Amino acid sequence: MYKPLPSYLTIKTSKVNGLGLFTLENITIGTNMGMSHIKIKDTIFRTPLGGFINHANEPNCAKVELLMTNDSFDYKKWNLVATKDIKEGEELTLRYTFYDI
């Protein structure tokens, strides 16, 4: 069953910009929080993880690209992974480079 966000994340007002993703518990480095974007042919779809994470020059998360295949076509998806230990209550951030593809 698809869940828009893992149970340990929430969306709330950000000091960075608008709304952001925040932790409800400590997250350890390397934690895969799920899919943030998917690209099928030339169209990019953003999940709530990709839509609410804010930019930072020194982020605590990164995108990990995965090439997927099925019987009809290949597609790419990106998962959001913690690059540092993140404390409860902290905002998740990412370096915005996705649309430089």
Residues of each region from the PLM?
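Conserved catalytic SET/PR domain of SAM-dependent protein methyltransferases, capturing the structural core
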Residues: 1-101
